Amino acid sequence: MAAAVGRDTLPEHWSYGVCRDGRVFFINDQLRCTTWLHPRTGEPVNSGHMIRSDLPRGWEEGFTEEGASFFIDHNQQTTTFRHPVTGQFSSENSEYVLREEPHPHMSKPERNQRPSSMVSETSTAGTTSTLEAKPGPKIVKSSSKVHSFGKRDQAIRRNLNVPVVVRGWLHKQDSSGMRLWKRRWFVLADYCLFYYKDSREEAVLGSIPLPSYVISPVAPEDRISRKYSFKAVHTGMRALIYSTTTAGSQMEHSGMRTYYFSADTLEDMNAWVRAMNQAAQVLSRSSLRRDVDKVERQAMPQANHTDACQECGHVGPGHSRDCPRRGYEDSYGFNRREQEEERFRAQRDPLEGRRDRSKARSPYLPAEEDALFVDLPGGPRGQQAQPQRAEKNGVPPYGLGEQNGTNGYQRTAPPRANPEKHSQRKTGLAQAEHWTKAQKGDGRSLPLDQTLPRQGPSQPLSFPENYQSLPKSTRHLSGSSSPPPRNLPSDYKYAQDRASHLKMSSEERRAHRDGTVWQLYEWQQRQQFRHGSPTAPIGAGSPEFTEQGRSRSLLEVPRSISVPPSPSDIPPPGPPRPFPPRRPHTPAERVTVKPPEQRRSVDISLGGSPRKARGHAAKNSSHVDRRSMPSMGYMTHTVSAPSLHGKSADDTYLQLKKDLEYLDLKMTGRDLLKDRSLKPMKIAESDIDVKLSIFCEQDRILQDLEDKIRALKENKDQLESVLEVLHRQTEQYRDQPQHLEKITCQQRLLQEDLVHIRAELCRESTEMENAWNEYLKLEKDVEQLKQTLQEQHRRAFFFQEKSQIQKDLWRIEDVMAGLSANKENYRVLVGSVKNPERKTVPLFPHPSVPSLSPTESKPALQPSPPTSPVRTPLEVRLFPQLQTYVPYRPHPPQLRKVMSPLQSPTKAKPQAEDEAPPRPPLPELYSPEDQPPAVPPLPREATIIRHTSVRGLKRQSDERKRDREQGQCVNGDLKVELRSYVSEPELASLSGDVPQPSLSLVGSESRYQTLPGRGLSGSTSRLQQSSTIAPYVTLRRGLNAENSSATFSRPKSALERLYSGDHQRGKMSAEEQLERMKRHQKALVRERKRTLSQGEKTGLLSARYLSQPLPGDLGSVC
């Protein structure tokens, strides 16, 4: 499968045919014989076997059904297991038992052993002839084996010497099972589509020979819902041309299934469809020709060689082997022409009626259809253009064989009167119809058996049935009339154009290498130069040929030099026009030039407005590639497929192509402006839409602010981390002035940036807070609106009104649900600005009796004289014992969140539900003669301590006992003495001194620490000024008596005693203190024993207590 096939490369009286499985064979019409070898190159073309570089000319390597390798000599039509050069067996056959015949010639008795449509198997009798001595073990494959065609070891071996047209990723649907889509790496080369597991292209997973396939987008009946999907449908040559009869419907072999592919983008899909159609149409629009002595049979319907044989796919060197039911004379269908003529006459009337009834528009241009039908001497339009038989006119038409033998003719234009257009036309129309159904759902599209819809005269139509020859290059006389304008893909065989391509500079090639078309173009040129230009025309270099090419270039509308038209490239058809009958003496491939008024469609782009032509094309095509319609002045040449024909582009065409692309841009803008609707548009239907839109806009504003704040915070954190490193370096290099100066300079710059970022962050935070307030307001409005709508919905009486209100409610719900995801993020961000988590706890000394500032203190309150502190101040808050208590909540030992000094005390709102009430004031003095009060038992919450495990409780008890004996702190806490008493000095100062320090401590001006662990912390509350006497809890630091040496001129208040270093203990003896402490410790031990006995019920008790009020006596809490 190496040599390229071209009609002009074949000698006279030679043509080629294609089997159903894509294999190509060549027909000598003069000798009535077939061969797998190209008559000029001597190499097989797509025969299903491998061509190796170490094999002589005409030799190929094949494989048996068992996998053994053998060699095929197409010259002698023999097979052998020995290498023709070395004479040795292949190393791959070491596991096989080979039996070589003395003269293994392809014999007729073994012709039925090979199944049809198996490209990967032998097309000759290689396997069967080598095993003739022992035919018993020979396994005859059934038709079910056909379904494994092209996979794994059955795949065609890829020739790495052939350039790759396209490669890339595609999704392919499995042929069986669950029909999953799998991603595969596809490579299009040598008219075959290979696919691999990945881009390394190591092992071929399968191969698909594209000739005789039709590639098109998926249709609705395919039931493929995947985007950008297309398919490769195998249809035999006769099925493309003649699909109405039973024989035609049987042409599609069961082994040739439909392949479904899916690309990632629309551009990729279009590129793959074009490239695969190029490879598929190389061999699918071919037909076989007859020579001069059978010219009278030219107008008769004849099918392909493969159709006359029921085995079809194997007309070749082993032709007689594959067709046992026929003799040599009827192997090509000549003896059946009389029967076919009768069948053709019987088919004329129904086909004619069907043509008259079809009113659907053809996807081809009228000029293109002219080229399709007028050029076919034996095809349907050939009969239509020539209603009477040539014999009736007295002069038989010229046969193709006669024209091929006429040396006076030179090719000056692509042949338009070739029977091979039947197949290509049917392929293109079927492709266009599938595309039209899928894209537009056009109900006027005809089924596949009516894929030639066109309004025309009621002339007889015929479909060739049994023999389709591929004519060689035909030539027009210099004085012959030119065919009408057309865009039909045909051959491109002009020495002038190829020479002008050689003049292209590398810059020009690079400048226009912008798509798949130009990639195919460059690939064709590389292959052409690499393989020695196998597609050179016969009349190349002839002066007459050059003149004819130039003269035709002035009369024809150019077509793209790249690819045949795809469904998206097909312009709309023009009005119907009758075809004039051919003149009696007009050769088969001469066509009549039509009057100027009948030539239109593609002429519009030249004589008329380009915008008008663009508008026509846009009606029936979603995308029209202007590269497929170059301007006037360039010959109408198309490339039938890659690697077969060279093509070129001169400087004039390149310049005109640029102009057309420029005009396309201008026309696109005008068309868009023209097509714009002038009807006004309403965005909002009701006030609900407006409110929801504003609400969503506010959410977007918050999102933007959140992103800005997030970015600023990241920058701030980075700068702070760098500055922290610089601070450490400053301390480290303190004794190095030079280095320290550099660090200081860098530090100063970063500090300026930090200040700027912090200012920006503060501004954005303020804006975020304002936006959040607006957001909450809008949310409240929307909620009220929702409630109103719900109320209206309940009251609504009419169904239409209820339906409209329900729609509005759904809109509100959808918007609220969509915005709820970001709401919590905004709340946390704004809350972190208002109430930061960590508040500063100062470590510097604080006045023992802090006071309010003059602006914040009440006029009646007087500041107390401060005293020097000796330790960190403790938070002390006043709270009447008779007031309502908040349930106690245990907290681990931690610093209390205090308010910043910058905040006003008026902003400090009490939060009774979050904090415990403040402690009442401490007493000043009491009489030692007084009976000490009885210590009440600990409340239930005393069981909730830091350590909840049994081991931790026991260890805590031991530590407290040891600390008590040593006079140390209990668990790191100072000893706390609790006493309930009536303090006259304190009561006297309720209206004066006492509330002031309490307020100053409670307010935001003071910085303080909490009592660690078990202290009851509460929200700010003012001591209610009352003349009643109420008991209070005394909180005293347990200090030794010997430390109390300082004396006071007046009694100290509770706060002064707390923050002063010396307390007077003269009123209580040491024995009384020890006795009191013992009672207290005994109560603690009893409670802990009770906790140890309860075990894991502690959590339940604490949960139960949280729902109960605090006991009346707080004196047991330490």
Curated annotation (Swiss-Prot):
Expressed in kidney and lung (at protein level). PROSITE patterns: PH_DOMAIN, WW_DOMAIN_1, WW_DOMAIN_2. The modification Phosphoserine is found at S533, S542, S566, S601, S605, S609, S857, S864, S868, S900, S904, S983. Residues 100-113, 334-355, 434-443, 494-512, 586-602, 955-966 have a biased composition (Basic and acidic residues). Residues 100-145, 334-512, 528-629, 839-873, 886-968, 1003-1024 are annotated as: Disordered. Its main location: other. Pfam families: PH (PF00169). The modification Phosphothreonine is found at T867. It is found in: Cell junction, Adherens junction; Cytoplasm, Cytoskeleton, Microtubule organizing center, Centrosome. Keywords: Cell junction, Coiled coil, Cytoplasm, Cytoskeleton, Phosphoprotein, Repeat. SMART domains: PH, WW. Residues 697-798, 1064-1091 form a coiled coil. Residues 564-579, 930-939 have a biased composition (Pro residues). It comes from the Eukaryota. SUPFAM superfamilies: PH domain-like, WW domain. Interacts with CAMSAP3 and CTNND1. Interacts (via WW domains) with TSPAN33 (via cytoplasmic domain) and with PDZD11; the interaction with TSPAN33 is dependent on PDZD11 being bound to PLEKHA7 and facilitates the docking of ADAM10 to zonula adherens through interaction of TSPAN33 with ADAM10. PANTHER family: PHOSPHOINOSITOL 3-PHOSPHATE-BINDING PROTEIN (PTHR12752), PLECKSTRIN HOMOLOGY DOMAIN-CONTAINING FAMILY A MEMBER 7 (PTHR12752:SF4). This is Pleckstrin homology domain-containing family A member 7. It comes from Mus musculus. The gene is Plekha7.
